[in-house]
Amino acid sequence: IFDPVGAGVSSLRNDMTKEIVENYPLALIRGNMSEIKAITKLIDLDTENDSVAKGVDVAASDVISKDNLDINGAIVKALAKELNTVVIASGPIDIISDGEVIFGLENGDEMMPLITGSGCMLTTIIGSYVGANDPLLGGITACALMTIAGENAAEYVRENDLGTGSFRT
């Protein structure tokens, strides 16, 4: 499982990301849409790609929405096909592809991106599920689990008038 944190931000991160995706077999790549687009640039994959990385957080123009779902889905699918792996772009709508099919999951809560490390938590859960399952099925299941847990945690926070530091289930 590879989480390309901050891909597209610095030459060090770009060089390491390129080396990993080109030289090591990966069961799955999970990143935000800016990180996924950065990988497509690094390997010269021909996609419509206007992303500008801005650190470890997704660029505002790369936040996955219904308006850009088709183009972002095509990018995720093309990268998965090119690298022969499962690719997950996480966001308000998670896009998951093995290069043949594309799935979109629209669960979660707008509070989730405010929790530092939520993407890393998702990658850890994905690792648990992919270790025991097909990478595509494991990735879908892990994303569903994380986003539904996020909905439950957000409900708890709102019902108890708490802040994001109490975001848990």
Predicted regions and their residues:
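Short pre-catalytic strand/loop immediately N-terminal to key active-site residues, enriched for Gly-Thr
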Residues: 105-116
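Short beta-strand elements of ligand-binding domains
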Residues: 1-4
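Electropositive phosphate-/nucleotide-binding environments in soluble metabolic enzymes
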Residues: 11-14, 33, 69-73, 120, ...
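Charged C-terminal helix
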Residues: 148-169
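Short, small-residue-enriched loops and turns at beta-alpha junctions
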Residues: 6-10, 95, 112
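Glycine-rich beta-alpha junction loops
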Residues: 33-35, 93, 109, 143-147
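Conserved phosphate/ATP/ADP-binding segment of small-molecule kinases
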Residues: 11-102
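Short, small-residue alpha-helix embedded
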Residues: 38, 116-145
